[in-house]
Amino acid sequence: MASLSLGNLPVNDPAYVRKVVRTVVRALDNVIDLNFYPVPYAKITNHTYRSIGLGVSGYHHMLAKNKIKWQSEEHLAFVDKLFEQINYAAIEASSDYAKEKGSYRYFEGSDWESGAYFEKRGYCSDEWKELREKVHRQGMRNAYLLAIAPTSSTSIIAGTTAGIDPVMNKYFLEEKKGSMLPRVAPDLSPETYWYYINAHHIDQNWSVRACGVRQRHVDQAQSMNFYITNDYTMRQVLNLYLKAWECGVKTVYYVLSLIHI
């Protein structure tokens, strides 16, 4: 797995995003061949399907830098467009590498070959139709492409926010391996301050809706958390899970609660 650091990428430059995605897809595919497999069956599975996990981190960082409020329709529209671009670039890259190196073993008869993958997601623009034809003609190097990891540790090194989660606070202490690390919202300034809403202050329905929007473009799963307070009832928590299911979200990672003092 690897993650695009969205808060540190010029996400409004499609050509640059495409270039980075293509590079990461090639790198992840190479890892499959170079990796050490202590379990033989893991090697068999990896070489059969050649699945990779291209994900993201710095999601809230990106929104704040672009002055987009988490609880807004602008947020949903922005990430719908961005993740479609990322997915398009990843599929295009995998198909091109299939032409260069060969498709994964079970491409024939798959949703990729039949075009069902594109139909299920409503990818029907002329640009997507061209890519669909290319995939049918050239094949796919990888059976699965996108998966979003938590990145709670690696995001610290990258100086950005974790995965697709909102920040816990503009400033907080986080325990890592027995040590307390001070965390400050990246690029915090008078301009970005108002776009960093604490995770537990966010209406979780907005987070669920955003996850559903992204899921259309993510063929695997997303590390998505619920942030609730002790004011939540069991019915409200259940409703969040039902909402996630209705939005097509595949998984929910943790339910992180906060007690009001």
Task: Give the role of each language-model region.
Residues 43-49, 76-84, 225-233:
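Conserved short loop/turn motifs at secondary-structure junctions
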Residues 3, 14, 25, 56, ...:
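Alpha-helix initiation and N-capping motif
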Residues 1-46, 56-66, 160-161, 167-191:
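Function-dense linear segments that define catalytic or interfacial modules
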Residues 21-43, 69-151, 240:
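Internal maturation/activation junctions in enzymes
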Residues 51-69, 236-249:
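Hydrophobic/aromatic-rich, well-ordered segments within soluble, folded domains that form packed cores
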Residues 28-33, 117, 121, 134-141, ...:
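Catalytic alpha/beta core of large soluble enzyme barrels
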Residues 20, 51-55, 86:
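Short, contiguous, pocket-lining structural segments
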